[in-house]
C-alpha cells in the first residue's frame, strides 16, 4: 500500500500478518485485525523512528489498485466500486460538451466519497426530481448480471427502488438494444437511499456495470462500462 502522511509525504509498504513466512512460522496465522500490520519500506525500529517520518494517527493508507485491462476487454482492479461509474459520468459530461448534446432537463452530476459510511447522498439540489445512483452492479450466485452487462437494481437491503423510474430505465435499455439485467441485491446500500433518509421527496434508482468480487480484487468488462454509459446517456438526453 501507499501511506500518505499529514504533511503530504508519501511512503510505501506492504500489508502482512505477523507471521507471513510459511518456511518460518510453525502454524498458519489467520488474517484478522489483531494480527495484521503495515510493514513500511523504511528503516524504522521504534515509535520514535515512525514519528520522525511524520506518520501519525489519522493518516491515509491506500492500497495499490493493481489495475489491468486485458485484450479481451476485462478490467481487473481494486476500487472498481466505484471508480468505474465515476469514469462513466465524467465521460458523459465530456460527451455533452464535445458533441454539443442538448439536455432536455436539468442534470446534476454529484460525486461523493461517503457512500460506504451511509451519508453520501444526504444532500442534492433542492429542485431534484429523480436521483439515479450510478454505482456497481452485483455479479454472483442467483443474480442475472455478468461483468459485460449493465445492472438495473429493483431492490436492495434498503427496500425497493422507485417502480416508475426502474421501468423507464428498463424501457430505455430495451429501446437501445443494451445488454442488461434486473436484479435484487441482498447486501447493498446506495447513495440515493441516504437522499431519501435526508427527507428528499424524489424518485430513486440504481444502476451500474457488473462487477465481480466486490470489495476485493474486482473484475468487470468494457462491455459493462459501455452498456452503462449508453443507458445513462440515452436516459438523460431523451
Regions found by a protein language model. Give the residues of each.
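N-terminal hydrophobic/helix-forming segments and targeting peptides
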Residues: 3-238
